[in-house]
Amino acid sequence: MFGLLSRFSNRPTARQVRTAALFVGEPATVDTTRTLDTILRAAVADDASDVHFEPKEDGLVVRFRLDGEMRDHTRLPLIQRDPLLARVKIFGGMDITEKRLPQDGRAKLDEDGKRIHLRLSSLPTVHGESLVLRLLDQTMPVKSFGELGFGPEASEALHAALTGPAGLIFLTGPTGSGKTTTLHAALHALDTSGRVVCTLEDPVEYQFEKIRQTEIREKIGLTFATGLRALLRQNPDIMLVGETRDAETAQLAIRAALTGHLVFSTLHTGDALAAIPRLRDLGVEMFLLAASLRLVAAQRLARKLCPACKAPHPENGRLAEQHGLSGAQFFTAVGCPACRGRGYRGRLAVHEVIPVEKFLPLIAANAPMAEVHALRAQLGYRTLRQHGLAVAAAGLTSLEEVLRVL
């Protein structure tokens, strides 16, 4: 073995290599290792979050997810397809003889001063197994709310909710919107000295000292609900529940908040206030929600414009007038060597953060959502769209990107 792959935690034995070669019917040459080494080096250098190996009838397509967008990396001939897929599965500790069922795997690597954990998943397709590798840089420091894109007012509201002794904090958004990263920022912002902090995550992506992290394993019955019920017997002060998926988890989270625990969790809703009817649909009594809820927030991830090459938008005047932002200066993506021609570098959170104290009477009375939204407008809390337009007007992202993520 050589290069980056020599530092894998799951390096294949000589016997595994020979077995893989016999199984796929190709010679056990070093070329497959070189190819995988090159692909992973490129993924690490590009800060890719995921690497996709997509089998086709005539070969294998490798794509990277960069700042949330899929980009083609390379295309390999048919002769390399099955040997490379087998090699990836070996490094992930997966069964190369099982191609009919989905599998999960794990590996670790050190590259360029980074300690990266990899989560692998396989899925049978008509042309072979699709493999996806999620790259998780364990050396990356936890970012503050400000570094994630939360403004001063939003950061202050989040910190105020975190200083309370108990209550529920819900973060909403679709898959891939950065909810887990923001929850980790919240845990990092807490003063955990003298307090027990526990998490239930699916899966555990980043590991933290002084925090007890539990990974959900639904195949053996360890769900969020069963985990949360057990967690309540562990004498915790602060709990992070990765997702509130069902009625039992929702009701247990409410119970935990009402009995003196600070609870963070996520929901899949379109905006922050939509968490209220979602929890009602899960069977939560509104008077109990009003007694426990402290803050709701929603977010999306937008790509940041590359500061080295962004340019004023050619239709700036029309766009500013169209969106009611007279005098705003919008920018557009161009592309340069600094951003590898993409026009964007990194991502930031487009968000809405709503402390619910003044909404509690309406929540307890199960008032129509029209009244809740009217109060929101009266109090001046910004919507996702309003914050997105403000971020674009500040030149941090493009208007096209804001409209794409919203």
What are these model-derived regions, one by one?
Residues M1-P12, T19-L406:
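Short, flexible helix-loop junctions that flank or precede catalytic/ligand sites
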